Amino acid sequence: MLNALYPLFRPALFSMDAEDAHHFTLNNLLRAQRLGLGGCIGNRIAEDPRTVMGVRFPNPVGLAAGLDKDGAYIDGLASFGFGFIEVGTVTPRAQPGNPRPRMFRLPQADALINRMGFNNGGVDAFIANVKASRWKAEGGVLGLNIGKNADTPIERAADDYLYCLERVYPHASYVTVNISSPNTKNLRQLQGASELDSLLSTLKAAQQRLADQHKRYVPVALKIAPDLDADQIGNIGDALVRHKIDGVIATNTTISRDAVKGLPHAEEAGGLSGRPVFEQSTHVVRALRQVVGDAVPIIGVGGIFSGADARAKIDAGAKLVQVYSGLIYRGPTLVRDCAAALRA
């Protein structure tokens, strides 16, 4: 039902502040789910299982992190038929993020700019929400995305990632280490060769220790930026293989404005997502695949607005895909279209 109605609702939603519309939609989606209306508003998607990172995904279309930062809306979002859902980014301590307004639509370009700044309620509240999810309890594949607090010095970033990893590990299908948001000062420095080598070494050791402790191996993936040159992609790919990291998510938002110059809000600070990042993010997927081969599976995200876009990510070397901005513009029909295009 929502597939048909979303185009009618969208003008009203787009008349609201972008962040207010975001919360309004999620709250009403969760309310409908709790009233037992999830089957009426969502998608029924046939299973098309893929095993990636040792995890069985019911279908290859997932929700990217950022839409549900606190894991508070998992059950409502699950009604869209995702093969997996990623929530976060979460940090050790609660933080408000950047001042509002901090999210902007560029409808002429099917794009968003955000400078949210990892606003979240902290990892303990996050875990409580995850544990309360019925969908997760019934076997839903849930990725938990972790980051560092804004006031943690970059030299101590590993402490924040370790703190979060230890707490989310028992509750995750996989864990994503976000080092690529442009909205936390100096965070992307962690993509540098020496910084990344040190961080991955630390996290891999912790993962092995936690696997022994919990008698369960939870894969760890790294989320990277699209704003990388060939040498940087090569260095990151080599580090992923060398440290036996389980997966990589390519990509986060871009700081480039080349594709949206002159549009309202184009010069707002933050990360640009949506259709304009498609080519750039797909290039990173393709280049990264040439470096890592089959050793490190890639989850492709960035600018997916159609089944053909999802197929292009897979053809470039991704094993799974994620959507976010396309969902805002197209609604849950996008999930159905992508799943159909990728059906084996």
Swiss-Prot record:
Catalytic activity, EC: 1.3.5.2
A Gene Ontology cellular-component term: cytoplasm
Chain positions recorded as substrate binding sites: 69, 114-118, 178, 183, 252-253
Organism expressing this protein natively: Cupriavidus pinatubonensis (strain JMP 134 / LMG 1197)
Functional summary from the UniProt entry: Catalyzes the conversion of dihydroorotate to orotate with quinone as electron acceptor.
Name of encoding gene: pyrD
Chemical reaction(s) catalysed: (S)-dihydroorotate + a quinone = orotate + a quinol
Cofactor: FMN
Principal localisation: membrane
Keywords on record: Cell membrane, Flavoprotein, FMN, Membrane, Oxidoreductase, Pyrimidine biosynthesis
Binding site for FMN: 65-69, 89, 145, 178, 223, 251, 274, 303, 324-325
Name listed for the protein in its UniProt record: Dihydroorotate dehydrogenase (quinone)
UniProt xrefs under InterPro entries: Aldolase_TIM, DHO_dehydrogenase, Dihydroorotate_DH_1_2, Dihydroorotate_DH_2, Dihydroorotate_DH_cat, Dihydroorotate_DH_CS
Family: Belongs to the dihydroorotate dehydrogenase family. Type 2 subfamily.
Active site: 181
Organism placement in taxonomy: Bacteria, Pseudomonadati, Pseudomonadota, Betaproteobacteria, Burkholderiales
GO molecular function list: dihydroorotate dehydrogenase (quinone) activity
Subunit annotation: Monomer.
HAMAP family xref list: DHO_dh_type2
